[in-house]
From Swiss-Prot:
Role: Catalyzes the conversion of 4-hydroxy-tetrahydrodipicolinate (HTPA) to tetrahydrodipicolinate.
Name of the protein this chain belongs to: 4-hydroxy-tetrahydrodipicolinate reductase
Superkingdom of origin organism: Bacteria
Active-site residues annotated for this sequence: 159 (proton donor/acceptor), 163 (proton donor)
Gene behind this protein: dapB
Family annotation (Gene3D superfamilies): Dihydrodipicolinate Reductase, domain 2, NAD(P)-binding Rossmann-like Domain
EC class (word): oxidoreductase
GO cellular component, one term: cytosol
Binding of (S)-2,3,4,5-tetrahydrodipicolinate, residues: 160, 169-170
GO process annotations (BP): diaminopimelate biosynthetic process; lysine biosynthetic process via diaminopimelate
Subcellular location: Cytoplasm
C-alpha cells in the first residue's frame, strides 16, 4: 500500500488554510502533517480540526515551528505572504520536499530567491491554482497571438475587501499570458493605476484595473478591444475550494519530480 502524502499547511487559521485542512482530511491518500501560524497568532496551540470545523480533533496543534514540521513532510502548501514564503522556500529546499506556492505580491528580487530555492526543491508556483483560470490563460495567450496590435488588451479583476495586493496574482498571470502571446515582456507594456489626465492610451499596453469589495472570491475579465468590436474572456470563482483542490493536485503531481520551478500549466498539462 502506498503511504499517504504528508502535507503541511501554512496560515492554518486563515480561510484557505482551513479549507485545505478540511479537504486533506476528506481526501484518500493525503494526510495532514501540521499547520503553521505566525509568531504571536492567537491560534497557536489550537487543534487544527477545531480551526477547520471538523467533527473530531486531529491531535495536531497550530505551531510556529516551521523547521520541525517541514523536515518530516512530503509537501508544503503555502498561501501566505511573500516574506514568509521566502523563509518557507529555504526550509523546503533544505528538506527537498514539494513546495506549492499560491502566495502573490512578490517583488522581482523575491522571484529570484524562489528560483534559487527551486534548484533544490520541487516548487509549483502559480498566481491561481484553479483549472478554469489556467485554461483561461491558455485562451488569452492564443487570442493575443492571433490578434494584431490594433487590438487593445485590458484586464479587470475584483476581489474581497480584505485582499492586500493589487493587481491580483491571477491578473498578472493573465497579463503574462497576453504578453507571451504578443512576444513581449509584461514589465515593458504593463499599465496600472491610471488616474487624472493620463493622455491617450499607449499602443501595445496591457492595462490593469483592480476592484475591491464585499466577499468576492475572484472575478477576472480580459478584454480585447478594437474599432467596432470587442472580445471578452473571463472567469468567476464561486468558492475558494477550487484553489485548494488545485494546490492539492499540485502537491500530488510533484511527488517524485526532480528540483525545478513549475507552474499549474505543467501540473494540468496545458500548453
Amino acid at each position: 500500500m502506498t503511504a499517504d502524502i504528508k502535507i503541511v499547511v501554512t496560515g492554518a487559521a486563515g480561510r484557505m488554510g482551513r479549507t485545505l485542512i478540511r479537504l486533506i482530511h476528506e481526501t484518500e491518500g493525503l494526510s495532514l502533517a501540521g499547520g503553521l501560524e505566525g509568531e504571536g497568532s492567537p491560534y497557536l496551540g489550537t487543534d487544527l480540526g477545531t480551526l477547520a470545523g471538523l467533527a473530531q480533533p486531529t491531535g495536531l496543534a497550530a505551531t510556529a515551528d516551521a523547521l520541525t514540521l517541514i523536515k518530516d513532510a512530503d509537501a508544503l502548501i503555502d498561501f501566505s505572504v511573500p516574506a514568509a514564503t521566502l523563509e518557507f522556500a529555504a526550509l523546503a529546499a533544505q528538506a527537498r520536499i514539494v513546495h506549492v506556492i499560491g502566495t502573490t505580491g512578490f517583488e522581482v528580487v523575491d522571484e529570484e530567491k524562489i528560483k534559487a530555492a527551486a534548484r533544490h526543491a520541487t516548487i509549483v508556483k502559480a498566481g491561481n491554482m484553479s483549472l478554469g483560470v489556467n485554461l483561461l490563460a491558455a485562451l488569452v495567450r492564443q487570442a493575443a497571438k492571433a490578434l494584431d496590435g490594433q487590438w487593445d488588451i485590458e484586464i479587470v479583476e475584483m476581489h474581497h475587501r480584505h485582499k492586500v495586493d493589487a493587481p491580483s496574482g491571477t491578473a498578472l498571470l493573465l497579463g503574462e499570458a497576453a504578453a507571451e502571446g504578443r512576444g513581449v515582456a509584461l514589465e515593458d507594456v504593463s499599465a496600472r493605476g491610471r488616474d487624472g489626465i493620463t493622455g491617450a492610451r499607449k499602443a501595445g499596453d496591457i492595462g490593469f484595473a483592480s476592484l475591491r469589495g464585499g466577499s468576492v472570491v475572484g472575478d477576472h475579465t480580459v478584454v480585447f478591444a478594437t474599432e467596432h468590436e470587442r472580445i471578452t474572456l473571463g472567469h468567476i470563482a464561486e468558492d475558494r475550494s477550487i484553489f485548494a483542490r488545485g494546490a492539492l493536485k499540485a502537491a500530488r503531481w510533484g511527488q517524485g519530480k526532480g528540483p525545478g520551478l513549475f507552474s499549474m500549466a505543467d501540473v494540468l498539462g496545458i500548453e
